[in-house]
From Swiss-Prot:
InterPro entries: Bowman-Birk_prot_inh (IPR035995), Prot_inh_BBI (IPR000877). Keywords: Disulfide bond, Protease inhibitor, Serine protease inhibitor. GO terms for biological process: negative regulation of serine-type endopeptidase activity. The lineage of its organism: Eukaryota, Viridiplantae, Streptophyta, Embryophyta, Tracheophyta. This is Bowman-Birk type proteinase inhibitor 2a. The record marks 42-43 as: Reactive bond for chymotrypsin. The record marks 16-17 as: Reactive bond for trypsin. Inhibits trypsin (IC(50)=0.9 nM) and alpha-chymotrypsin (IC(50)=1.1 nM). Disulfide bonds join 8-61, 9-24, 12-57, 14-22, 31-38, 35-50, 40-48. Belongs to the Bowman-Birk serine protease inhibitor family. The keyword tRNA-binding does not apply.
Amino acid sequence: GDDVKSACCDTCLCTKSNPPTCRCVDVGETCHSACLSCICAYSYPPKCQCFDTQKFCYRACHNSEKEEVIKG
């Protein structure tokens, strides 16, 4: 679906098994769009992390263009 296509992750950890088990460990105000199991800490702003595991990593959220925009 579109949720999986638009999902992104900057920090993805995978096991060395075959197939690998991968998990996105990004912490942010929301979880990525394809996340089914999103756990958020009651803080302001909230700190959320996705606890889904899958056999792949999503593409990185930050490409060089976005980083330049943030720095500017």
